[in-house]
Amino acid sequence: MSGSKSVSPPGYAAQTAASPAPRGGPEHRAAWGEADSRANGYPHAPGGSTRGSTKRSGGAVTPQQQQRLASRWRGGDDDEDPPLSGDDPLVGGFGFSFRSKSAWQERGGDDGGRGSRRQRRGAAGGGSTRAPPAGGSGSSAAAAAAAGGTEVRPRSVEVGLEERRGKGRAAEELEPGTGTVEDGDGSEDGGSSVASGSGTGTVLSLGACCLALLQIFRSKKFPSDKLERLYQRYFFRLNQSSLTMLMAVLVLVCLVMLAFHAARPPLQVVYLAVLAAAVGVILIMAVLCNRAAFHQDHMGLACYALIAVVLAVQVVGLLLPQPRSASEGIWWTVFFIYTIYTLLPVRMRAAVLSGVLLSALHLAISLHTNAQDQFLLKQLVSNVLIFSCTNIVGVCTHYPAEVSQRQAFQETRECIQARLHSQRENQQQERLLLSVLPRHVAMEMKADINAKQEDMMFHKIYIQKHDNVSILFADIEGFTSLASQCTAQELVMTLNELFARFDKLAAENHCLRIKILGDCYYCVSGLPEARADHAHCCVEMGMDMIEAISSVREVTGVNVNMRVGIHSGRVHCGVLGLRKWQFDVWSNDVTLANHMEAGGKAGRIHITKATLNYLNGDYEVEPGCGGERNAYLKEHSIETFLILRCTQKRKEEKAMIAKMNRQRTNSIGHNPPHWGAERPFYNHLGGNQVSKEMKRMGFEDPKDKNAQESANPEDEVDEFLGRAIDARSIDRLRSEHVRKFLLTFREPDLEKKYSKQVDDRFGAYVACASLVFLFICFVQITIVPHSLFMLSFYLSCFLLLALVVFISVIYACVKLFPTPLQTLSRKIVRSKKNSTLVGVFTITLVFLSAFVNMFMCNSKNLVGCLAEEHNITVNQVNACHVMESAFNYSLGDEQGFCGSPQSNCNFPEYFTYSVLLSLLACSVFLQISCIGKLVLMLAIELIYVLIVEVPGVTLFDNADLLVTANAIDFSNNGTSQCPEHATKVALKVVTPIIISVFVLALYLHAQQVESTARLDFLWKLQATEEKEEMEELQAYNRRLLHNILPKDVAAHFLARERRNDELYYQSCECVAVMFASIANFSEFYVELEANNEGVECLRLLNEIIADFDEIISEDRFRQLEKIKTIGSTYMAASGLNDSTYDKAGKTHIKALADFAMKLMDQMKYINEHSFNNFQMKIGLNIGPVVAGVIGARKPQYDIWGNTVNVASRMDSTGVPDRIQVTTDMYQVLAANTYQLECRGVVKVKGKGEMMTYFLNGGPPLS
C-alpha cells in the first residue's frame, strides 16, 4: 500500500519561513494560541499568555523572515487579533475564499495589507515563488504559466491567484509600434506580414521587389475553396453595400451625362435611349441586389453585368456626342476605371482587364473620330498617361484594401481557431477537474476566485459538515501478492480495471468515491445530497465490490478478496492545503469506519450498530466481534455485525428497482451498460463540442448546441465562423459602435486603440502619390507649352517628394540606413498624426503640380479679339467667327493670339484631369480618415474652381470656341458652311460638376474603406478578447489541474486528444519517497460544540499542511512532487520524471532529505507559536516505484511498489520528532556527508527485521 490508511482529521496551514524563525511578536503567538484554544474547545483571551515571546529557535530574524511573518499573520500593528466568531461561515458552508482576479493579476501595495509585503518577500528570495511586483513585466511569467511551469500555491487557498501571469487584452497591446496592422506582399493567402513591431524591418532584394510587384496584379485567393467561400461570405454584406453605392454613383454619372447632352442640341435619340436604359438597368439591379434572395452566388453575375453596362455607356458616349474631341469622355472614363477598382467587388484580374478595356476603347474611338487632327498625337499620349495613372492608382488602392480584408479575415479566423482550441482544452480540463473534485466544491472554488475577499490571518478552508451519512472502507486482501506477480503496466491496468468497476458501482449505488489509498477504496453515501437510504447504498456497494473482486480472483488465479467496513455518522468534507488537492472526509466516524475495515473479514461486510439501525431490518446479520481483531474497536467498545444476506423484502425491492431502471433505459434508447474497464480521462477528454458561442461580437449564440462534432478541427472552425458570419449584423454593429457621419467609435477607449494602429504601407502610399505626380508632370509636359517655370517647379517638387518617399520607405528597410534616418522614419510612420501631415503635404504638392502651369498661359480673351475683328458684340461671337478669322486660330497653334507674348494653352481641360488625378492620389492614403479626406478634397475643389472661374476663365472660354470650331471644320470637310447652333457645354460649367461628382464618389469610397476597416478591427478585437478570455480561463484551469495532477501527467493526457484511451503508467528507477505524519494529531482532534464539531482542529491541520505546501513550492525543492495527504500524513516523492531524476548526482534524494528536515524545523516552530506539542514522525526510502493514473470516472495519480510500502513503514515504526531512513537511503546520504546515526534493527510488517537509521542533519557547513 502507498501508506497508512489511518484517516485522522486535517486542517491548518502556514507559511514557510526561510528557517524556523518566530513569526512575529506576541500578537502572532496569540493567534496561534487562539487557533489552538478554539481547536480544543476552550476560550481564548487575546491578552493572555505570551509564553515564548523572548524564546527564539534558529537565531536572529532575517529581513526576509520579518517580511514573511508580517504577511503571514497581521497586516497592521494591532495588539489584538480579530476574534473568531462562533458562527463562522466556514462551519455551515464553504467559506473558502479566494483573491479576486485583479489581485492575482497585479498585487499592488495596500496600506497595512499583505499584498505588497508578499511581493517584497517574493522578490527577496528564499520563499516560494510569488506574483511579480506590481508594474513589473509579466511576459516571462505568462510564458512560464503557459508552459505549465508554475503550480498553484494559493494564500488562503487562493488557487494560484498570486501566480497568475494573465496576458493583457489584445486591445491593451495595440500600442504604437507593435505592428498590429500587418502588410501583405501578395501571397496566395492574403499576404504575409511586413510588420515592424520591434522597430526592425525587412531588407528587400531587387528580385523580391519584382516578385512582390508581380504579385500585386495576381488575383488573391485562399488555397482552400471552402475558406475562399467563407471569406466571400465574410465580406458579402460589405460588398453588397459597395455594389449598391457604386450603382448609385453610376446613376448619378449617367444623369450628369444626360444633362450635358441635353444642354447642347441637337439631341441624339440613340444616345438618350442608351443612357436612359443604362439608368433603368442599374436601378433594377440595385433593387434586386438588396433583396433578401440575393446571395453570394449572384454577386459575380451582378458585377459583370454592371461592367457590361459601363462598357455600353462608354462606347455610346464617345461615338455619338458632338462636337467631337479626343479629350471628350476622359473624366467619366477615369471615373469608371477607378470605381471598378475600388467599389466593384471583383478580383484584381477582372478589375485590371476592365480598366484596360475601358482605356483601350477610349483611345481607339478617339483615334477613329479625330484622325484628321494634327495635334491628336499629343492628346492620345496625354490620354494614355491619364488612363495608365488611373489604373495604377486603382491597383494601388484595390491591392492593399483586399490584402487588409483578407488579412483581417485570416486573423479573425485564427483568433476563433485559437479560441475554439482553448475552449476544447478548457472543457477537457474542466471535465477532468470535476472528475476529481465534486461539482459543488469545484464550483464554490471558482465562484470564490472571482469574488473579492479580504485577506485573513489564516488560510481559509473548504469544510462542509454533513450528518447522517454512511462511510465505506474497502481493502484488497492479498494485494501484495498480486502486485508481486505483475509488471508495472499490468499492475496499473489491473488496478484501473478494478477501480473503474468500483467507480461505476459507486455511481449506481449513489455513493461518492472519496479517495484511493493504494489498494484501499473508500466512499460515502449521502454526499453531497442527503439520502435517507445511505446505509442501504453502502451495503449494496459493498456486496457489489465483493462480487467484482471475485472475477479478478478467477482471472488472475491470485487469492484476492475484499474486506469491507461500514459506519454511519457525521463527516466533514472538503479539501486541505494549497497543493495537490484531493477531496476528503474527516471525523471520528471516518476513523471508526476505517477501523471497521481493518477489523473485518475477507469477503464479508462489517457494519456498526449505528449502520444497522439505518438498515431497518432489511438485511440478516450476525455478530461481527470486531473487537477481537482490532484494538481500536475493542478499546471503544464498538458493537459490530457482519451482513449475511438481504431479507426477502429487500430482494423484492431490489428487483423492482432493477426493473424500473431497465424500463427507463429502454425508453430512452440507451444500450446496456458496458462492464469493460474504462480508461482514465476517457470520460473527461472525449468531447470536442462547443458549449458556448462568442458573445459581444455582433451575433447571437447559435440555437443548435447539439450539432454533430466535426472530426476535423479546421472544419469545426470554418463551421463556427460560417455561423458567426451568417448571424452577425453589419448594420447593428455599425449603429452600436460607430457614429454615422464621423465614423468614430462611440467608446473613447476603442477609438484610442484604433488610432494607435500602425499602417506599415504608408511608404507605398507616398510612393503611389509621387507616381501620380510624375504622370501629371508628363501629361502637362506633353500637352502644355513648355516654360522655365514649369521645369524648375517640377524639379523642385520631384526632389521634395523623392525625399519624402525615401524617408517613408526607410521604415521597411531600416537595416540599410543610419539610426537618425530610422528614427525619423519611425516617428512619421508610427504616428497617425505625423503620417497624416506628411500625406497632406504630399497631396498638396501633387495638387499644385496639376494647375500651377495655368498661370503661365496666354490669358487674352479670344472672344474679345474676334468681336473686335468682326466688329460685333461679345455676345454675338461663336465658333463660326473663328473659322472666318484672318488670323487662322486653331487648337494646334501655341503662338499667343491677340498679340500676347505668352503661349496658348488650348487644352485647359487637362488641368482639370490632372486635378482629378490629384484627388485620386488623395484616396490612396488609407490611413487618413474619411472626414479628413473630405475636408482635403473640398479644399482642393474650392481652390481649383475659384481659379477656373476667376483668373483662368478665359482659358476655358477660348478652348470651348476652338474645340467647337475644329469640330465644325472637320464635319464640313473644308466647306464654309456653319451650323446655326454650333456650341458645347462650357468647360467652366462642366468642371465644378465633374469635380463634385469625383469628390462625392471618393468620399463614399473613403467612408466604405474606413467603415470596413473599423468593423474588421472591432470584430477582430472582440474575437481576440474572446480568445484571450478563454486562454486565461484555460491557463487558470490548467493551474488548477496542475494542483491536482503532476504537470507532466496532466500534459500527457491533455496533449493527446486522439489517444486519450491510453493508460498512464511509468516505471521509475530510483525514487525517494517520504511519509511525514503528525503522530499525536488524533489525540488533538476532538469534536466539541465549542470548536464547531472539530472544524477548528481541521483549520489548524490545514495551516500545517499549507505550510508544508509552501515549503515544497520553494525553488530548491522543485524536484519534489507532493503525492497526497492521508489524514494528518503528508506524502511526497522525488525523481518521478526525467526532469527531476538525477541519476548521477542523486540531488533529488538529497532534496527530499532536506525537505524532511525542513518539515521537522517547521513543526517545532508551529509548536512554539501554537502552544502545542505536535510530534512528527518521518520515514524515507528510495527505490523503484510504479507511477500511474487509475480510476476512469475520478482519475487519481499515485505511486505503488515495495519502496512506497517500506517508506510508509519507516513512518509508522518511527520515533516522534525523528526522521527514520532505510539502509539504501543511508548509503546515499552518508556518501554526501549527511549526519545520520544507526537506530538498529526494527521489525517491519511484511518485511521482517530491517536495519534503520536516523537522519540528524545535513552536510556540515564548509
From Swiss-Prot:
Modified sites of kind Phosphoserine: S97, S156, S667, S755
Subcellular location: Cell membrane; Cell projection, Cilium
Record-linked InterPro entries: A/G_cyclase, A/G_cyclase_CS, AC_N, Adcy, Adcy_conserved_dom, Nucleotide_cyclase
Purpose: Catalyzes the formation of the signaling molecule cAMP in response to G-protein signaling. Mediates signaling downstream of ADRB1. Regulates the increase of free cytosolic Ca(2+) in response to increased blood glucose levels and contributes to the regulation of Ca(2+)-dependent insulin secretion.
GO molecular function annotations of the record: adenylate cyclase activity; adenylate cyclase binding; ATP binding; calcium- and calmodulin-responsive adenylate cyclase activity; metal ion binding; scaffold protein binding
Disulfide bonds: none
Regions of compositional bias (Low complexity) in chain numbering: 47-59, 129-150
Recorded coiled-coil stretches: none
PTM sites of type Omega-N-methylarginine: R23
Source species: Rattus norvegicus (Rat)
Subunit structure: Interacts with GNAS, GNB1 and GNG2. Part of a complex containing AKAP5, ADCY6, PDE4C and PKD2. Interacts with RAF1.
Glycosylation sites: N871, N888, N973
PROSITE patterns registered for this protein in UniProt: GUANYLATE_CYCLASE_1, GUANYLATE_CYCLASE_2
Regulation: Activated by forskolin. Activated by GNAS. Activity is further increased by interaction with the G protein beta and gamma subunit complex formed by GNB1 and GNG2. Is not activated by calmodulin. Inhibited by adenosine and ATP analogs. Inhibited by calcium ions, already at micromolar concentrations. Phosphorylation by RAF1 results in its activation.
Guanylate cyclase domain sequence ranges: 470-597, 1072-1211
Bias-annotated ranges (Basic and acidic residues): 25-37, 152-172
Membrane topology category: Multi-pass membrane protein
Co-factor: note: Binds 2 magnesium ions per subunit. Is also active with manganese (in vitro).
Descriptive protein name: Adenylate cyclase type 5
EC numbers: 4.6.1.1
Cofactor needs: Mg(2+); Mn(2+)
Tissue specificity as recorded in UniProt: Detected in brain and kidney.
Chain residues that bind Mg(2+) 1: D475, D519
Positions of ATP binding: 475-480, 517-519, 563, 1124, 1198-1200, 1205-1209, 1245
PTM field: Phosphorylated by RAF1.
Pfam families: AC_N (PF16214), Adcy_cons_dom (PF06327), Guanylate_cyc (PF00211)
EC top class, as a word: lyase
